[in-house]
């Protein structure tokens, strides 16, 4: 993968083909929430089995992609990343037993970004006033949605999705260290899948499996996760860095739209307010961090790569 800081200039135009691929990728990420909600809320499969099938099918598709590119899959296991992937995938599944698709996607997105930004601050990253304001706005949006009330979501499901977001934030930061994200993602899927299956065998006393549930889980793992990741890692090399970070804001919106149209879920004023606050806040953070990095005098290219790469890796998580 090309260095993020040099993959596309901030002024370069995005071709029509790239725009279509980008739209397909973002739709795939949003579809993960729809497929999971369809499978679990509909009672077609239990969460542990769904997670196992999702990771297995993702591992198969990612391996086939590497083989098709005449590359020998090499398993280079990163234990913390593998564990984070497992926690993310399982918590993601559990949460959608009780969360609407749009709500889950928004909580996941917010938790990932807050986790990654918090780690950045701990490591000494400095934010502009605009980025700080955006961070506070995003956190306020999440807190506002989580306040008790008639429209509040089940707290157990909310906690599971926040855990999934924190885990994916950790996975993203681990992935930011590598140079070949497709190979790294394949390795982590190959390592996590059998362990998750083992957990399902050991602890899955409440198995509930239907053909429809298996198909939905396989689509989530192989199509919207596996192929979605490959498309994302391909398309980010062709678009400006700020665009790559910003377009991810559309994923929760697409998921909420899909939930309303496909699943018949309500779009509440509470969710709309939280969505505007969280997505608007993250947009300010992205823009503010970009400006801070561009203005830095010490090793600007490396700093830009570190910030942008984290944003790019996250895109594979929804």
Residue spans for each PLM region:
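Hydrophobic transmembrane alpha-helices of multi-pass small-molecule transport proteins
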Residues: 62, 85, 127-147, 164-166, ...
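Glycine-/small-residue-enriched transmembrane alpha-helix faces in small-molecule transporters
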Residues: 1-52, 87-91, 140, 150-177, ...
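Hydrophobic alpha-helical transmembrane segments of multi-pass integral membrane proteins
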Residues: 16-24, 48-64, 133-137, 155-163, ...
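Helix-helix packing/entry segments at the starts of transmembrane helices
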Residues: 90, 104-111, 175-193, 225-261
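Specific alpha-helical transmembrane segments that line the substrate/conduction pathway
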Residues: 49-60, 85-86, 93-126, 164, ...
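Specific transmembrane alpha-helical segments of multi-pass solute transporters/efflux pumps
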Residues: 28, 63-112, 117, 137-144, ...
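C-terminal-most transmembrane helix of multi-pass membrane proteins
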Residues: 2-5, 55, 147, 249-318
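Hydrophobic/aromatic residues within transmembrane alpha-helices
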Residues: 39, 50, 54, 95-98, ...
């Amino acid at each position: 993968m090309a260095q993020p800081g040099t993959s596309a200039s901030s002024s370069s135009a995005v071709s029509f083909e790239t725009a279509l691929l980008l739209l397909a990728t973002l739709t795939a990420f949003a579809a993960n929430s729809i497929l999971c909600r369809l499978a679990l809320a509909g009672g077609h499969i239990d969460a542990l089995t769904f997670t196992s099938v999702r990771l297995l099918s993702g591992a198969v598709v990612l391996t086939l992609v590497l083989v098709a590119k005449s590359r020998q899959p090499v398993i280079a296991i990163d234990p913390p990343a593998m564990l984070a992937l497992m926690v993310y995938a399982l918590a993601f599944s559990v949460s959608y037993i009780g969360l609407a698709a749009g709500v889950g996607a928004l909580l996941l997105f917010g938790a990932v970004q807050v986790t990654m930004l918090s780690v950045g601050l701990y490591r000494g990253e400095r934010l502009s006033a605009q980025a700080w304001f955006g961070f506070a706005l995003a956190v306020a949006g999440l807190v506002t949605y989580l306040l008790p009330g008639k429209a509040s979501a089940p707290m157990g499901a909310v906690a599971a999705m926040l855990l999934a977001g924190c885990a994916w934030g950790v996975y993203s930061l681990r992935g930011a260290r590598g140079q070949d994200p497709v190979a790294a993602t394949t390795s982590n899927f190959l390592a996590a899948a059998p362990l998750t299956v083992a957990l399902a065998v050991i602890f899955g006393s409440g198995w509930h499996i239907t053909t429809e549930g298996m198909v939905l889980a396989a689509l989530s793992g192989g199509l919207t996760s596996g192929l979605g990741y490959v498309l994302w890692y391909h398309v980010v090399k062709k678009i400006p860095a700020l665009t790559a970070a910003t377009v991810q804001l559309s994923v929760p919106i697409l998921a909420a739209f899909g939930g309303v149209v496909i699943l018949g879920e309500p779009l509440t004023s509470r969710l709309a307010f939280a969505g505007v606050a969280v997505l608007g806040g993250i947009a300010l953070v992205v823009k503010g961090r970009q400006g801070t990095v561009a203005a830095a005098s010490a090793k600007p290219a490396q700093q830009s790569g570190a910030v942008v790469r984290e944003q790019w890796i996250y895109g594979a998580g929804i």
